């Protein structure tokens, strides 16, 4: 069974809770869909955990926040710095050269069985498109399933859980999944799932998100996992990063 986790955002408490839940649920493989760092208070701890998973065979991708952290700092033209760059600057001071080397060698997409995994959109992974509309989902799914052996694609980046299914009669349809309820998926159908965010949900529910997929039975389950998100928010405040990062975690938005 494949556990799919995305947008960890340096939130070690959320990651540990999701990994414990996945292991208890029978996960035997792991795919980490990028944005390991950014916003959260524990980038080094999260990277250490992910690197250990990678050493055991997990697939790990690079996201836009990972890319920004290892890029050259953005030059100031005034006193205003985008919040993403504020986060990247802070993160650079918290991680090691070994962490940076690990991030820079990560791919943007990978194939796991009949699944393509990608942080943003399969049609242009480096442009960081949000797969948050039927149109964007269609472009992503089309690009993914043009690859030999790919039937479905798993995506991160939007911090929400969604399921898109291509019907023979109605074309691509969108569903909002119910946590813990399995989707039994007919063979030969193409579909797309956005797996949500482990470390920074944005749908009004502060619980961590991830998904489990059993390729043998073609059953997909989206999960929400309780963890101490208020302690994680307090750690952000203590880190000296913008308070907005903490309040967003507190509200799940």
PLM features: residue spans?
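Short aromatic-enriched loop/helix-cap "lid" or pocket-rim segments at secondary-structure transitions
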Residues: 71-75, 129-130, 165-168, 233-235
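Beta-strand-turn-beta hairpins that frame and shape the catalytic cleft
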Residues: 1-3, 110-117, 186-192
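Active-site environment of divalent metal-dependent phosphoester hydrolases
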Residues: 9-14, 38-41, 65-70, 111, ...
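His/acidic metal-ligating clusters that form di-metal
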Residues: 26-29, 95-168
